[in-house]
Swiss-Prot record:
Residue numbers binding NADP(+): Y24, G25, S26, Q27, R47, S52, D82, E83, L84, Q85, G133
Binding locations of Mg(2+) 2: D190, E226, E230
Family: Belongs to the ketol-acid reductoisomerase family.
Residue ranges occupied by any KARI C-terminal knotted domain in the UniProt entry: 182-327
Encoding gene per record: ilvC
UniProt KW Heme keyword: no
Record-linked InterPro entries: 6-PGluconate_DH-like_C_sf, KARI, KARI_C, KARI_N, KARI_prok, NAD(P)-bd_dom_sf
Domain of life: Archaea
Keyword NADP listed: yes
Species of provenance: Methanococcus maripaludis (strain C5 / ATCC BAA-1333)
Binding of substrate, residues: S251
Enzyme class: oxidoreductase
Protein's name according to its UniProt entry: Ketol-acid reductoisomerase (NADP(+))
A family per Pfam: KARI_N
């Protein structure tokens, strides 16, 4: 798999173009500011006088309605939540798409699953930082960047690569390294990682460990430290050095205990469940479920949020984070 760097990309394809960033959340703010600071012509499209309107203006952006931005721009970069994109696209963006324009995303969900079907003659690309928005912005300001992905679904103008690579350079991704992939691969692997490991798997593992210790009579504070708080230390070691060097940095007791017991926690059944989760992503079952959830105003999701908020580990964690001086990071 080829990795591109700053010297591989040029901004030339965007020099005379206008980029409309639709949305001003964490990624919208970071990506738009980075491209603006890279000398690109950026406008921000938002709901008139919405919560983000004044924030974007305060950051020095040329702010306009989504319709105005879509009409004005050559590249329309959609960074609003996945479940809102199709509706906004149909009513506020599609009427202003003309041949030669480029539709861009940072997640392939709506293109891959067919919720957005662009007209002929329009490029469809993706540029995705592999980091939260705050880090995208901070590392750019520090003179570096975060890794990212680019992909091309439709190259209607025969220069879609030049356009998306220039966007990646403008955001600062090529300072760290950019990998070219496909909408299918980006979407399916991203969803799987979130569900099985990063958001779903890890939180369930932490909860189970915490509850096991508390049910055995140990202090909830001790349980939190040992199953949640210290996780960051291990993840940071893996992030910086990989598995092998993480094992080198922990004690022999931790290494032996971890290596000999881990397969009893994540079993063959766990991997079978992961394969089923991946299959649900690949065949569209998860997508249908998520669409139905939106149709009932996220009733199930809201109920799950309430349950998570009432967990004992949340109450204990809030106290300990305050004690550790971490409350400012929340």
């Amino acid at each position: 798999m080829k990795v591109f760097y700053d010297s591989d990309f040029k901004l030339d394809a965007l020099k005379e173009k206008t980029i409309a960033v639709i949305g001003y959340g964490s990624q919208g703010r970071a990506q738009s500011l980075n491209m603006k600071d890279s000398g690109l012509n950026v406008v921000v499209g938002l709901r008139k006088n919405g919560a983000s309107w004044e924030n974007a203006k305060a950051d020095g952006h040329n702010v306009m309605t989504i319709e105005e931005a879509a009409e004005k721009a050559d590249i329309i970069h959609i960074l609003i939540p996945d479940e809102l994109q199709a509706e906004v696209y149909e009513s506020q963006i599609k009427p202003y798409l003309k041949e030669g324009k480029t539709l861009s995303f940072s997640h392939g969900f709506n293109i891959h699953y067919g919720f957005i079907v662009p007209p002929k003659g329009v490029n469809v690309v993706l540029v995705a930082p592999k980091s939260p928005g705050k880090m995208v912005r901070r590392t750019y300001e520090e003179g570096f960047g975060v890794p990212g992905l680019i992909c091309i679904e439709i190259d209607a103008t025969n220069n879609a690569f030049d356009i998306v690579s220039a966007m990646a350079k403008g955001i600062g991704l090529s300072r760290a390294g950019v990998i070219q992939t496909t909408f299918k691969e980006e979407t399916e692997t991203d969803l799987f990682g979130e569900q099985a490991v990063l958001c779903g798997g890890v939180t369930e593992l932490i909860k189970a460990g915490f509850e096991t210790l508390v049910e055995a009579g140990y202090a909830p504070e001790m349980a939190y430290f040992e199953t949640c708080h210290e996780l960051k230390l291990i993840v940071d070691l893996i992030y910086q050095k990989g598995f092998k060097n993480m094992w080198n940095d922990v004690s022999n007791t931790a290494e032996y205990g971890g290596l000999t017991r881990r397969s009893r926690i994540v079993t063959a059944d766990s991997k079978a469940a992961m394969k089923e989760i991946l299959k649900e992503i690949q065949d569209g079952r998860f997508t249908k479920e998520f669409v139905l959830e939106k149709q009932v105003n996220h009733a199930h999701l809201k109920a799950m949020r309430r349950i998570e908020g009432d967990l004992q580990i949340e109450e204990v964690g809030a106290k300990l984070r305050k004690m550790c001086g971490l409350e400012k990071e929340e």
